[in-house]
Design a protein with these regions (language model features):
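Short, conserved turn/kink motifs that form compact alpha/beta structural patches or helix kinks used as
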Residues: 2-3, 26-120
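N-terminal intrinsically disordered, low-complexity, charge/repeat-rich segments that act as generic
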Residues: 1-22
């Protein structure tokens, strides 16, 4: 028996849901002094930044850690680079974050539908 998948039209992330702007500086290299070098920043418009708070316990002390997931749509977000690189910097609300995970999400084709980027 052959399974026939129905065609799907997956809508893009809604523009009214993409309420934030970020600045992205792509990781370039480490120079000979072990300093990280970044590309010139680009402003990406119409993204969503969702924060989460976790408590980390190390020995006798504990601290709060703020992580975020950034949603970037392939159609509705503006000034989107072709790819995102781990170790790159994201600036949001005056604070710098480092990309630790890039998840390209595909809907029904080989082209990216949106990205989910985890930062710390």
């Amino acid at each position: 028996m052959k399974v026939v998948k129905p065609p799907t039209n997956v809508p893009q992330l809604p523009l009214d849901w993409l309420i934030h702007n970020i600045s992205y500086e792509a990781y370039k290299e480490e120079n000979r002094h072990n300093e990280v070098v970044y590309e010139q920043g680009v402003e990406i418009e119409h993204v969503r930044v969702d924060f989460s708070k976790s408590n980390q316990i190390a020995g006798l002390s504990d601290s709060d850690r703020y992580d975020a997931v950034i949603f970037i749509d392939a159609v509705n977000s503006m000034n989107v680079p072709d790819d995102f690189i781990s170790r790159s910097k994201i600036y949001f609300s005056g604070k710098a974050y480092k990309i630790v995970k890039v998840i390209p999400c595909f809907a029904t084709s080989n082209s990216v539908h949106h990205w989910e980027i985890e930062v710390v």
